[in-house]
């Protein structure tokens, strides 16, 4: 699931008339809180396996610019954010540097103390969030940072983690995406997770794409990302990266303290979902094959643990060439 949606806001950018229905934002905020904690655990717990690292603070970003004037009051109420044109924290991971610093969902963070807050470029509602993600990803992981909260500066000491930020897509379509630095999980995909361990399976799969450099490797292989990706060599290479992400994901889960066997349960439930396509896309393995592949990795994890060995996933350090 490497592709990034071009319209992450379709589900929350509903007409103002639809706001008469129950607000979708409390459920979205709750999901973002889960994703923040899971993403923080996965990135920091697996930092030694990541060739590219960045400081992890344990937050997900929010921005009033994501919402129309009619939507903004309900959204800001769900997150506890002030009614200002200032980025805020949509979620804070439990036990993270952000939580230790006293930050919480709704905390305003404009940028670094003493610096102009980044505004982003273009009309993309996520432009300012993307600029903030890049700003904080480029900071040293071993030094505290002073945040501009619009009040007194807040000191925060990050933890080194894999180079990835996380977002939640509010749409009901079951989808996930990874572009090398970002992981996006849709609300529609999360609904197949019965608990946090199963949600971690979906997130770990996308994180595995980033850790294994799949976007860059596919680009170097010259794949077609248009209609032709479903055929021939293009489909075969995309499928190889999906298999690799499936194989690495239970190792990432185990190393972060999650039950790796939850990945088997999650992908089985997802594969057996009602309304799934009748024809299997050539870019992804069948769900039965995915479950079997993950089960094989889980047995390898259990064998290493039984032998008292440190976990050593075969794909780390030596992923097979795309061919």
Predicted regions located by residue number:
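A Zn2+-metalloprotease active-site environment signal
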Residues: 19-323
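Bacterial N-terminal signal peptides
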Residues: 5-15
């Amino acid at each position: 699931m490497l592709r990034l949606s071009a319209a992450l806001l379709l589900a929350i950018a509903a007409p103002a008339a639809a706001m008469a229905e129950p607000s979708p934002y409390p459920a979205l905020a709750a999901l973002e809180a889960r994703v923040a904690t899971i993403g923080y655990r996965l990135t920091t717990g697996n930092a030694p396996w990541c060739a590219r690292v960045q400081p992890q603070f344990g937050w997900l970003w929010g921005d009033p610019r994501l919402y129309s004037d009619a939507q903004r009051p309900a959204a800001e109420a769900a997150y506890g954010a002030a009614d200002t044109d200032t980025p805020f924290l949509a979620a804070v991971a439990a036990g993270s540097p952000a939580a230790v610093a006293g930050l919480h969902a709704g905390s305003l963070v404009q940028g670094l103390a003493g610096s102009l807050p980044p505004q982003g470029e273009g009309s993309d509602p996520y432009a300012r969030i993307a600029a903030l993600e890049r700003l904080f990803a480029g900071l040293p992981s071993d030094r505290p940072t002073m945040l501009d909260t619009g009040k007194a500066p807040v000191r925060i000491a990050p933890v080194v983690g894999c180079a990835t930020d996380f977002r939640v897509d509010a749409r009901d379509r079951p989808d996930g995406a990874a572009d090398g630095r970002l992981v996006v999980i849709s609300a529609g995909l999360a609904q197949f997770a019965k608990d946090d361990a199963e949600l971690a399976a979906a997130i770990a799969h996308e994180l595995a794409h980033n850790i294994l450099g799949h976007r860059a490797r596919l680009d170097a292989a010259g794949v077609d990302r248009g209609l032709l990706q479903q055929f021939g060599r293009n489909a075969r290479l995309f499928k190889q990266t999906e298999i690799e992400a499936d194989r690495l994901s239970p190792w990432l889960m185990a190393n972060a303290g999650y039950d790796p066997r939850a990945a088997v349960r999650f992908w089985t439930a997802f594969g057996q979902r009602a309304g799934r396509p009748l024809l299997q896309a050539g870019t992804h393995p069948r769900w039965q094959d995915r479950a079997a592949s993950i089960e094989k990795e889980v047995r390898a994890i259990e064998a290493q643990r039984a032998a008292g060995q440190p976990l050593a996933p075969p794909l780390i350090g030596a992923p097979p060439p795309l061919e």
